Amino acid sequence: MGCSTSRNADVASAKLYVPELKELATMLQTALKDNFETVETEVTECIDLTKWGCAAPGIGGNCRIIDVGGVPNLLDPKYHKSAIFQLPSVAEQVGLKGAYIYGACAASHLVVGVNAELMPTEHISKKCRCTKYSKVLEDGSHTMEAYDSSEFGLLGNFVACDGKTTPVVKVRVKKRKGEENFVSCMRKGLAKALEESKVNVDGAKSAQIGIGGVFKVVSGKIHGHVMPDFKKTVMIDGPEVEEWLNFYEMGPDLTCLSVFLSGDPAKEKQESKEDFGLDLRLEHTHFFSQSKKEGGHYHFDKTPDDVEYVGYFLPAPVVYRVDNAFARERACQADK
């Protein structure tokens, strides 16, 4: 892969371990019990998620996780105009034309006019789109509006599926007593469970679980960010990006679209700095309100005594990596 500002349509994939739903419910119960005072997990039929503002009633059927682009597209201005993607094209690239897609990504600046957060929930074949975007205003406040496009920019983490109502794992937690946020707690708990069980998956270097789900912040406030417009200079990931982001306290009554993995199934050793695997982002959650102009990127809750989450989750058997921006940057460095 040479050094170029044009997009490369490369697609890689890796198998994931798919536990039985009862097993997954038990794993999540164990993962969450030390972090929240009340934890309830069960296998049940998914509620009608259109009532939560989603474009499909369920999250089941032919599930697959997708990681598109990457942070390098955000850091360097030379990619801001070229790193533009279309959800229907991504669905076709992973073999699920017309899919229901939900998750967390950046908006297209060509649609919004500025850099912004995107909360995609779109059933492509049914031509049903409930996507929202959130942007920073000139006075430093933020707003959220409907987004009438399938286009997104820079990076994204998604679940593609049929959008069917199927059995799922329902999780309800209240009153946080530990330090982890809701999503990180589940993700790290699954990683620990897999490490202890030594599960193998044919064709993968290491067994990992990938989860997609929709959850609601029923009560309490959360800490989230909204990206401002692009910087005109190259940023270094880390403190510089944290300082650039705009953080707000939002909630409750937030619908959260979440994608997370216990680890990268293409990596032999998860902590290795030489083994890049698929360069996967291990968790990404965006949220929107149905009653207020609030939306953005979820970090953690700010009111541990009052917080309550309830959500519906499913494992996916495969993760796809599309247009890997990290691999492109390594190729650029090698060409110098």
What does each model-found stretch correspond to?
Residues 7-206:
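Extended, low-hydrophobicity segments enriched in charged/polar residues
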Residues 36, 85, 100-102, 133, ...:
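Phenylalanine-focused residue identity feature
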Residues 80, 109, 123, 142, ...:
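Histidine (H) residue identity feature
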Residues 158-279:
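Long, positively charged binding patches that form subdomain-scale interaction surfaces
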Residues 260, 270-274, 278-332:
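Compact beta-sheet-dominated globular domain cores
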